[in-house]
A protein has these predicted regions:
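Active-site nucleotide/adenylate-binding loops and adjacent lid/helix of ATP-dependent enzymes
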Residues: 3-29, 34-83, 88-187
Length: 187
């Protein structure tokens, strides 16, 4: 099968911890043909969805890429959106372009309207029975109150990824104010 992965720039991915590369490696081991693309390589020509992609192959130490070519998205067995946050206008427009490609027969995994309207960090709110008590807020006073109640908490942004801006806070932490300003953007 032929799969195209819409990714962040490959040079920014950390091969030892990036889940997109892990998924791709497993797909490669199973004999699938892999291609990579980025958000700005999705487009409409007239009303026709198109994608610029490069054939991707793992090597012992790294990977190789073939020349970028233009394809009809429906020519792939699957398009897999794996772009990390931020959820900005480019991301939003990419989901619209992927919806258009799907309406023309492309098999798009990670449903474009679902990833547009569903924040993965908020998914815990649907299954609270499987999570510790949590608080979702940008209000510093509420976070301090939660910290006083639990004495040891983890705070992280809803739009982060890769462990960025995740902090463990304890009551005696000397940087509580700075951490809360950082995490809430002075909320």
């Amino acid at each position: 099968m032929k799969f195209v992965f819409i990714l962040d720039p490959l040079e920014k991915l950390k091969s030892d911890k990036d889940t997109s590369l892990a998924i791709m490696r497993e797909a490669s081991l199973r004999g699938h043909e892999l291609f990579v693309s980025m958000q700005h390589e999705l487009f409409l020509h007239g009303a026709t969805a198109r994608i610029i992609a490069r054939k991707f192959m793992f090597t012992e130490q790294s990977y190789t890429l073939e020349e970028a070519l233009e394809y009809a998205p429906a020519g792939f067995d699957g398009i897999i959106m794996r772009k990390d946050p931020p959820f900005d206008n480019e991301y939003l427009y990419s989901t619209y372009l992927l919806e258009n490609a799907a309406s023309q027969g492309a098999k798009v995994y990670n449903n474009p309207s679902a990833i547009r309207s569903w924040n993965e960090k908020m998914s815990v709110t649907r299954f609270p029975q499987f999570a510790p008590e949590f608080l979702v807020t940008s209000n510093n006073d509420l976070i301090r109150e939660f910290l006083n109640t639990h004495q040891d908490i983890v705070v992280k942004p809803l739009d982060g990824m890769g462990g960025s801006s995740i902090f463990r806070l304890g009551l005696s932490d000397p940087n509580i104010s700075v951490i809360l300003e950082t995490i809430t953007n002075f909320g």
